[in-house]
């Protein structure tokens, strides 16, 4: 089988003056005028961008520069046609356009590579983005090479019936398939409110443009915070559509700066400073680690498409609903004007362009922070996430103004205690998000919560370099959104009947549970027993086979009926929980013998007591005892699991 001609990363860039480029105008006709939500009425000339990647910084003053980035998928067998012998073709494209081009390595298990294209251009004197983009010109050239590589080189690619999945010209049909990787926060500019923009682009270009659903077999190189935009149609029509899509993406990528003229700081320079190898590594890790279903919606069909190939819309009669999602972010009181001020604020952007409601709490004596509340009407199958985009804009406003000496920034979200449980499980624990993004993500202790916050809230604090912190915020909000809709769905679904064995089905062979003899039975009788099993089972299935097992789950309980202020059903209150976790033999040398201090860290972060069981000479297994309130015990177990996962994934 013929393989790609090269497996190396190709990086081509050079310092160039953004005002003296080899080409003076774009090749494709991309003057298009679109109205509708997500972008307003804008005329695009040249330019493109928004894939979410690394732009090479120019030596010019960063405050006057605008970075544009694209990411296009190329089948591995066609990569040689883009690179050329010894990189001659890609070098020629770079020299002709002045853009930086990076052909990513092939991720194991993928059939496609990402080709990343970036540029840095000086802004116009009034702060507007440049009218011409070298990155867009290079995108067109790379796209041409992808389409031409089959005829020029030949390759042992996929069969004709699978050709659409990889991009290129479908044999005999003349249909072209092109796929761009786009940051989730920029997808909204292509969809518009109610899908109006994407439908208008389809009609205008006579192509089929769609956001691929997550149930598709997407490449592993595409992270959870990215989507694939696929364009299908005749050759010239697809080129036309690519010009329009890339122009809208570029406008979205630079919307922050175009709305904040006169600002002295920009997140772009911090993104560039974060390192060029960070994001590709993060994509591979997050694709491998997080189950997609916990973060992503599974239906991205347009609600207005007449195309036969569009993902099927929800049938009439199903319960299609939208709910108000609410997020809260803490803002330093002296910086609140940067968000809501008439001259410097971004309220108009948030309310009119993104479509969210924004409320700011009154100052509270003794607190140097105020709460900004973001709310938006969203549906579970809506790929556009307005509340998340609004949070990212607010994060940019705050962090650009108060970076510390180490170039680290801090973002603090307020989350209701009842929702914070989704951040403590295997699939989305703060420790896993922290590990994957390179940030510190913590649930702060009760005494660290500011006075302006409710006693029923917890503070999730993200600390790290700006680009990593934004990625962590994306992953965190995706998880919270998924949990919120799950909660809403469960409220409308009748509760399933419970039994003493039901909650533990599916984990046999992985977990071993036994109630200790000192459990105090309450007046609820069998109901209390069921509650114990259910409570434990919310934690137990999160361990993978071989990662560890719970030997005993004993609870010293004092139960009483307590009034419930929400619509949830009243349940007995469990005040103390004790778990004993059997450690796999393979992780003991690293977790216990070599790194005993990790247990102290888990104890400190969770508030639970985490100790090694040493008072049983006859015991041959390695057991960790966790004791504390149910919340503390669950948090400690999640942290312990995170350490075990990281140790096993690192290998021997």
From Swiss-Prot:
<feature type="compositionally biased region" description="Basic and acidic residues">
    <location>
        <begin position="1"/>
        <end position="14"/>
    </location>
</feature>
<feature type="domain" description="KH 3">
    <location>
        <begin position="324"/>
        <end position="391"/>
    </location>
</feature>
<dbReference type="GO" id="GO:0009867">
    <property type="term" value="P:jasmonic acid mediated signaling pathway"/>
</dbReference>
<dbReference type="GO" id="GO:0010286">
    <property type="term" value="P:heat acclimation"/>
</dbReference>
<dbReference type="InterPro" id="IPR004088">
    <property type="entry name" value="KH_dom_type_1"/>
</dbReference>
<protein>
    <recommendedName>
        <fullName>RNA-binding KH domain-containing protein RCF3</fullName>
    </recommendedName>
</protein>
<comment type="function">
    <text>Acts as a negative regulator of osmotic stress-induced gene expression. Involved in the regulation of thermotolerance responses under heat stress. Functions as an upstream regulator of heat stress transcription factor (HSF) genes. Negatively regulates HSFA1A, HSFA1B and HSFA1D, but positively controls the expression of HSFA1E, HSFA3, HSFA9, HSFB3, and DREB2C. Forms a complex with CPL1 that modulates co-transcriptional processes such as mRNA capping and polyadenylation, and functions to repress stress-inducible gene expression. Regulates pre-mRNA processing under salt stress.</text>
</comment>
<feature type="region of interest" description="Disordered">
    <location>
        <begin position="253"/>
        <end position="307"/>
    </location>
</feature>
<feature type="domain" description="KH 5">
    <location>
        <begin position="576"/>
        <end position="640"/>
    </location>
</feature>
<dbReference type="GO" id="GO:0031053">
    <property type="term" value="P:primary miRNA processing"/>
</dbReference>
<dbReference type="GO" id="GO:0010468">
    <property type="term" value="P:regulation of gene expression"/>
</dbReference>
<keyword id="KW-0539">Nucleus</keyword>
<dbReference type="Pfam" id="PF00013">
    <property type="entry name" value="KH_1"/>
</dbReference>
<feature type="domain" description="KH 2">
    <location>
        <begin position="175"/>
        <end position="245"/>
    </location>
</feature>
<dbReference type="GO" id="GO:0008380">
    <property type="term" value="P:RNA splicing"/>
</dbReference>
<dbReference type="GO" id="GO:0006397">
    <property type="term" value="P:mRNA processing"/>
</dbReference>
<comment type="subunit">
    <text>Homodimer. Interacts with CPL1. Interacts with RS40 and RS41. Interacts with DRB1/HYL1 and SE. Interacts with CPL2.</text>
</comment>
<feature type="domain" description="KH 4">
    <location>
        <begin position="408"/>
        <end position="476"/>
    </location>
</feature>
<feature type="compositionally biased region" description="Low complexity">
    <location>
        <begin position="292"/>
        <end position="306"/>
    </location>
</feature>
<keyword id="KW-0507">mRNA processing</keyword>
<dbReference type="GO" id="GO:0070878">
    <property type="term" value="F:primary miRNA binding"/>
</dbReference>
<dbReference type="GO" id="GO:0010445">
    <property type="term" value="C:nuclear dicing body"/>
</dbReference>
<dbReference type="GO" id="GO:1900150">
    <property type="term" value="P:regulation of defense response to fungus"/>
</dbReference>
<dbReference type="GO" id="GO:0016607">
    <property type="term" value="C:nuclear speck"/>
</dbReference>
<keyword id="KW-0508">mRNA splicing</keyword>
<dbReference type="InterPro" id="IPR036612">
    <property type="entry name" value="KH_dom_type_1_sf"/>
</dbReference>
<feature type="compositionally biased region" description="Gly residues">
    <location>
        <begin position="34"/>
        <end position="55"/>
    </location>
</feature>
<feature type="domain" description="KH 1">
    <location>
        <begin position="67"/>
        <end position="139"/>
    </location>
</feature>
<dbReference type="GO" id="GO:0006970">
    <property type="term" value="P:response to osmotic stress"/>
</dbReference>
<keyword id="KW-0694">RNA-binding</keyword>
<dbReference type="InterPro" id="IPR004087">
    <property type="entry name" value="KH_dom"/>
</dbReference>
<keyword id="KW-0677">Repeat</keyword>
<feature type="region of interest" description="Disordered">
    <location>
        <begin position="1"/>
        <end position="63"/>
    </location>
</feature>
């Amino acid at each position: 089988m013929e393989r790609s001609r090269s497996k190396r990363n190709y990086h081509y860039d050079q310092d160039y003056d953004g005002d003296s480029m080899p080409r003076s105008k774009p090749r494709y006709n991309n003057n298009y005028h679109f109205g509708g939500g997500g972008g307003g009425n804008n005329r695009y000339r040249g330019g493109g961008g928004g894939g979410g990647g690394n732009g090479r910084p120019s030596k010019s003053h960063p405050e006057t520069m605008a970075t544009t980035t694209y990411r296009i998928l190329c089948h591995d067998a066609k990569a040689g046609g883009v690179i050329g012998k010894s990189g001659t073709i890609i070098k020629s494209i770079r020299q002709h356009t002045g853009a930086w081009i990076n052909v990513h390595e092939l991720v194991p298990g993928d059939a496609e590579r990402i080709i990343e294209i970036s540029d840095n251009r000086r802004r116009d004197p009034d702060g507007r983005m440049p009218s011409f983009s070298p990155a867009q010109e290079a995108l067109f050239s790379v796209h041409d090479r992808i389409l031409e590589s089959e005829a020029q080189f030949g390759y042992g690619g996929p069969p004709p019936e699978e050709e659409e999945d990889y991009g290129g010209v479908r044999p005999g049909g003349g249909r072209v398939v092109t796929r761009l990787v786009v940051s989730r926060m920029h997808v909204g500019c292509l969809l518009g409110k109610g899908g109006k923009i994407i439908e208008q682009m389809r009609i205008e270009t006579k192509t089929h443009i769609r956001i691929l659903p997550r149930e598709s077999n997407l490449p592993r190189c595409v992270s959870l915070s990215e989507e694939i935009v696929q364009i299908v149609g005749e050759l010239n029509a697809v080129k036309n559509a690519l010009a329009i899509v890339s122009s809208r993406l570029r406008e979205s990528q630079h919307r922050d700066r175009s709305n904040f003229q006169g600002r002295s700081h920009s997140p772009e320079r911090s993104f560039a400073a974060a390192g060029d190898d960070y994001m590709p590594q993060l994509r591979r890790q997050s694709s491998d680690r997080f189950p997609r279903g916990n973060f992503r919606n599974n239906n991205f069909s347009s609600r207005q498409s007449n195309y036969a190939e569009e993902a099927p819309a929800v049938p009439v009669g199903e319960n299609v609903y939208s709910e108000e999602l609410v997020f809260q972010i803490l803002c330093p009181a002296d910086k609140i004007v940067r968000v809501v001020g008439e001259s410097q604020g971004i309220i108009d952007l948030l309310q009119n362009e993104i479509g969210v409601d924004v409320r700011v709490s009154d100052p509270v004596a003794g607190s140097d922070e105020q709460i900004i509340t973001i709310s938006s009407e969203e549906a579970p199958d809506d790929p556009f996430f307005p509340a998340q985009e609004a949070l990212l804009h607010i994060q940019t406003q705050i962090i650009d103004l108060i970076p510390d000496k180490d170039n680290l920034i801090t973002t603090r979200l307020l989350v209701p205690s009842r929702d914070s449980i989704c951040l403590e499980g295997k699939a989305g624990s703060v420790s896993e998000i922290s590990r994957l993004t390179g940030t510190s993500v913590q649930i702060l202790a009760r005494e660290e919560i500011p006075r302006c916050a409710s006693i029923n809230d917890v503070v999730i604090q993200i600390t790290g370099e700006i680009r990593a912190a934004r990625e962590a915020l994306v992953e965190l909000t995706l998880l919270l959104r998924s949990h919120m809709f799950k909660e809403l769905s469960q409220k409308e679904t009748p509760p399933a009947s419970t039994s003493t064995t039901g909650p533990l089905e599916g984990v046999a062979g992985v977990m071993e549970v036994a109630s200790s003899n000192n459990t105090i039975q309450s007046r609820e009788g069998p109901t209390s027993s069921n509650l114990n099993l259910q409570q434990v089972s919310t934690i137990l299935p999160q361990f993978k086979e071989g990662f560890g097992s719970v030997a005993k789950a004993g609870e010293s309980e004092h139960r009483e009926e307590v009034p419930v202020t929400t619509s949830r059903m009243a349940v007995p209150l469990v005040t103390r929980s004790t778990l004993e976790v059997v450690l796999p033999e393979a992780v003991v040398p690293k977790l216990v013998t070599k790194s005993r201090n990790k247990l102290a860290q888990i104890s400190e972060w969770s508030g639970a007591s985490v100790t090694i069981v040493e008072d049983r000479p006859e015991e041959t297994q390695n057991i960790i005892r966790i004791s504390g309130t149910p919340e503390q015990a669950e948090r400690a177990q999640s942290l312990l699991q995170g350490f075990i996962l990281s140790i096993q994934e690192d290998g021997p």
